[in-house]
Amino acid sequence: MTELSKPLRRTLVGRVVSDKMQKTVTVLVERQVKHPVIGKYVGQSKKYHAHDEAGTYKMGDTVEIAESKPISRTKSWVVTRLVEASKGI
């Protein structure tokens, strides 16, 4: 019999741009995509709402988020780890 394995979850790395909600942070993920006709690399960005149970991540932190089952209407990502803490002034 074959062993059922857990499906791989997509992971993204981005910057926390808002931590004003309870147990939720907004993460901005920026990517470089090659334009199909011109061939030039163009910057694209997208914001994701990610679950932060303890509320430990602050604005400016670089975090890794992973896809999960839907937690709410707009939230289907979970913060998995801190990549780099924000540089406080």
From Swiss-Prot:
Return the CDD domains for the record. Answer: Ribosomal_uS17
Q: Which UniProt keywords apply?
A: Ribonucleoprotein, Ribosomal protein, RNA-binding, rRNA-binding
Q: Which PROSITE patterns match?
A: RIBOSOMAL_S17
**Entry GO CC:** cytosolic small ribosomal subunit
Q: Which InterPro entries match?
A: NA-bd_OB-fold, Ribosomal_uS17, Ribosomal_uS17_bact/chlr, Ribosomal_uS17_CS
Quote the Gene3D superfamilies the UniProt record gives: Nucleic acid-binding proteins (2.40.50.140)
Among the GO biological process terms of this entry, one is: translation
| One of the record's GO molecular function terms | rRNA binding
What the entry lists under Pfam families is as follows: Ribosomal_S17
Q: Which family does it belong to?
A: Belongs to the universal ribosomal protein uS17 family.
Sum up the protein's function in the record's words. Answer: One of the primary rRNA binding proteins, it binds specifically to the 5'-end of 16S ribosomal RNA.
Q: How does it assemble?
A: Part of the 30S ribosomal subunit.
Q: Which PANTHER family match?
A: 40S RIBOSOMAL PROTEIN S11 FAMILY MEMBER (PTHR10744), SMALL RIBOSOMAL SUBUNIT PROTEIN US17M (PTHR10744:SF1)
The protein's name is Small ribosomal subunit protein uS17
**What organism, scientifically named, is this protein from?**
Polynucleobacter asymbioticus (strain DSM 18221 / CIP 109841 / QLW-P1DMWA-1) (Polynucleobacter necessarius subsp. asymbioticus)
